[in-house]
From Swiss-Prot:
This is Early nodulin-75. Disulfide bonds: none annotated. The keyword Repeat applies. Belongs to the nodulin 75 family. Residues 56-309 are annotated as: Disordered. Residues 1-25 form the signal peptide. InterPro entries: Proline-rich_CW_protein (IPR051308). Induction: During nodulation in legume roots after Rhizobium infection.
Length: 309
């Protein structure tokens, strides 16, 4: 509570000091009478004559005559280049329809009889296989309608059973002749019973006689005889050869670029100068009329009244 009271008292004192300082500064004690200062009456000066500022008249440019920019006369009509007249109608590479021919029909696979015609015999001479007579003059890429000839057809041979061999003599397939008097898989006579051995003498089964004493699988110690003195891996001195001396390598000259061919710096072509678009000249507008400032003399002349009262 005391701190709050002290704080409020300090604020009040500061406010009183701030408010009273300008009042005390203006208060001056008057010990004697000071008459008011005598001033000369103000001389009348007429107001200055208003001169409007001089504006130069705008330069008048006559409107340019209209010229269409870079218009060429239309050229005379010329047919487009590289155009050939339409050729007459010709069916490209059309062959006449041939007569009916059975396409690639082979005769039935019938072999001639092996008796009087051995296989792989050529047909008679009057029909050479696969030989066509020399045709008459034919234009290129056009074949005349040939006469009807069945392509690749042999004359019908006599009746031959296809792929039939004559019946061979009777031979039982894969039969061995009967062997001599030894019936297979026959047991021997009774006086020798099969797989019966006579009773052997008494022998202990699988018993070996006691061998002489031998140390079981003992190897002698690996003792090598003392080797003769040999210098370990010493090579004889080679003949005088410079050890691993390579010939001085031939260094190629450093890569040098060839002098570049002089090329003038790339210069852009001068831009096409187009005429400026038609612009209307600006309409002359006179400057707005400004009223001259009215001179109002101060009510107390040139100088303001003194503040000394």
């Amino acid at each position: 509570m005391t701190s709050v009271l002290h704080y409020s008292l300090l604020l009040l004192l500061l406010g009183v000091v701030i408010l009273t300082t300008p009042v005390l500064a203006n208060l001056k004690p008057r010990f004697f009478y000071e008459p008011p200062p005598i001033e000369k009456p103000p001389t009348y000066e007429p107001p200055p004559f208003y001169k409007p500022p001089y504006y130069p008249p705008p330069v008048h440019h006559p409107p340019p005559e209209y010229q269409p920019p870079h218009e060429k006369t239309p050229p005379e009509y010329l047919p487009p280049p590289h155009e050939k007249p339409p050729p007459e109608y010709l069916p490209p590479h059309e062959k006449p329809p041939p007569e009916y021919q059975p396409p690639h029909e082979k005769p039935p696979h019938e072999n001639p009889p092996p008796e009087h015609q051995p296989p792989h015999e050529k047909p008679p001479e009057h029909q050479p296989p696969h030989e066509k007579p020399p045709p008459e003059y034919e234009p290129p890429h056009e074949k005349p309608p040939p006469e009807y000839q069945p392509p690749h057809e042999k004359p019908p041979p006599e009746y031959q059973p296809p792929h039939e061999k004559p019946p061979p003599e009777y031979q039982p397939p894969h039969e061995k002749p009967p062997p001599e008097h030894q019936p297979p898989h026959e047991k021997p006579p009774e006086h020798q019973p099969p797989h019966e051995k006579p009773p052997p003498e008494y022998q202990p089964p699988h018993e070996k006689p006691p061998p002489e004493y031998q140390p079981p699988q003992e190897k002698p110690p690996h003792e090598k005889p003392p080797p003769e003195y040999q210098p370990p891996h010493e090579k004889p001195p080679p003949e005088h050869q410079p050890p691993h001396e390579k010939p001085p390598p031939v260094y190629p000259p450093p890569y040098e670029k060839p002098p570049p061919v002089y090329e003038p710096p790339y210069e852009k072509p001068p831009p096409v100068v187009y005429p400026p678009p038609h612009e209307k000249p600006p309409i002359y507008e006179p400057p707005p009329l400004e009223k001259p400032p009215v001179y109002n003399p101060p009510p107390y002349g040139r100088y303001p009244p003194s503040k000394k009262n």
